[in-house]
C-alpha cells in the first residue's frame, strides 16, 4: 500500500495463469478451464492448492503448511452442509424445504436456528440458549427493527430513496443521517444534537 493508501500492482493475464506483481514480489494464480483457482504461489515460494467437484463447488483448500480445510454440500441444492477446519473442528448447516438456511451447529454441538418469512427474509434467530431475536422489515424488504424478548433493540427508518435516515437505539435515542445527491452521507446528527459533517 502506497503513501496515499492505494494498492499498486501490475497484472499479467496468461493462459490459465494470472501474475500479480506488487511491492512484495510476484504472485501467481493458476486456474482450470472453468475459471476455478487451482493453485496460488506467493513471492516466498509457498503454495496453496484447491480442489473442486464437477459442479464447481470448492471441496478442499490445502495451505502451504499442509493443513486442509474441507467442504461438503447437499445433493438437493448444492449448498454447503459441512465445513471442516484445518484443526478438525466441524460446522454443520441445514436448510428448509425452500433451500433457505434453517440452522447451524458449531463444533461444540450448539445449534442456532433461523426462520424466514414468505419472502425468504430471516425473521427469527434463536441461540443455543433459547434466546430469540426477531427481525422486522419494510414492505420493500429493508430491515426496520430488531427485537429481543419483545423489546425493540434497534429501529431503522428510511427516506424515499431507501437510505437509512433515522436509527433508534434501545434507549429510544434517535440518530439521523443526511445524504448528498450521490447517496453519500454528508451529515450525521446524534441524540444530543451534536452533528458531524462528511466531505467526499
Regions found by a protein language model. Give the residues of each.
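Extended charged/polar low-complexity repeat regions
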Residues: 1-200
Amino acid at each position: 500500500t502506497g503513501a496515499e493508501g492505494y494498492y499498486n500492482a501490475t497484472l499479467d493475464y496468461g493462459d490459465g495463469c494470472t501474475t500479480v506483481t506488487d511491492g512484495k514480489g510476484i504472485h501467481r494464480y493458476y486456474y482450470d478451464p472453468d475459471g476455478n483457482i487451482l493453485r496460488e504461489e506467493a513471492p516466498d515460494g509457498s503454495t496453496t492448492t484447491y480442489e473442486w467437484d464437477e459442479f464447481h463447488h470448492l471441496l478442499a483448500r490445502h495451505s502451504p503448511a499442509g493443513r486442509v480445510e474441507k467442504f461438503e454440500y447437499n445433493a438437493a441444492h448444492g449448498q454447503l452442509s459441512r465445513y471442516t477446519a484445518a484443526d478438525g473442528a466441524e460446522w454443520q448447516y441445514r436448510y428448509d424445504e425452500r433451500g433457505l438456511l434453517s440452522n447451524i451447529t458449531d463444533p461444540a454441538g450448539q445449534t442456532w436456528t433461523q426462520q424466514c418469512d414468505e419472502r425468504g427474509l430471516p425473521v427469527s434467530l434463536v441461540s443455543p440458549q433459547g434466546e430469540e431475536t426477531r427481525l422486522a422489515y419494510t414492505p420493500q424488504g429493508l430491515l426496520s427493527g430488531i427485537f429481543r424478548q419483545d423489546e425493540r433493540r434497534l429501529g431503522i427508518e428510511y427516506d424515499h430513496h431507501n437510505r437509512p435516515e433515522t436509527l433508534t437505539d434501545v434507549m429510544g435515542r434517535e440518530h439521523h443521517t443526511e445524504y448528498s445527491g450521490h447517496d453519500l452521507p454528508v451529515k450525521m446528527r446524534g441524540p444530543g444534537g451534536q452533528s458531524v459533517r462528511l466531505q467526499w
